[in-house]
C-alpha cells in the first residue's frame, strides 16, 4: 500500500459514519448479527479505545501505523461483545444506573433456625397473635 493510498484511507476513516463502514475500511471480519445487536455498544467501546491511543499528531506522518492502531482498537471492541454482553460492559449511563448492587449481609445478621426446635402450638399461637 502506498503512502498516498494510506492517506486516502485515513481520510476515508474520518468520513465513516456506520459500524459496517469502519469494519469494511479497516478490513475487520465481523458477524452482521453481532453488529446488529451490539452496534452502539461496539461504537462506544471503539471510541473509548481510540481515546486511549497516543495523540494522532505524532503519527500523522505515518497513516499506515495509525490505521493499524485503529484496526486493533476496532478488533478489541468487537471481540468485547462476542465474548460478553452489553450488560457485562455497561458502557451507557442507563445500564450503569441499573447495575446490580452488591448484597452484603454482615455475619452478625445471620441466624439459624433448626427444624423442630419450636413447638407446633407455640407457632400457632404466634401466628394468631400476629393477626
UniProtKB/Swiss-Prot annotation:
Keyword terms of this UniProt record: Nitrogen fixation
GO biological process: nitrogen fixation
Protein function: May protect the nitrogenase Fe-Mo protein from oxidative damage.
Pfam family for this entry, one: NifW
Subunit structure as annotated in this protein's UniProt entry: Homotrimer; associates with NifD.
UniProt key word Chaperone: no
Protein name: Nitrogenase-stabilizing/protective protein NifW
Similarity comment: Belongs to the NifW family.
Keyword Glycoprotein: no
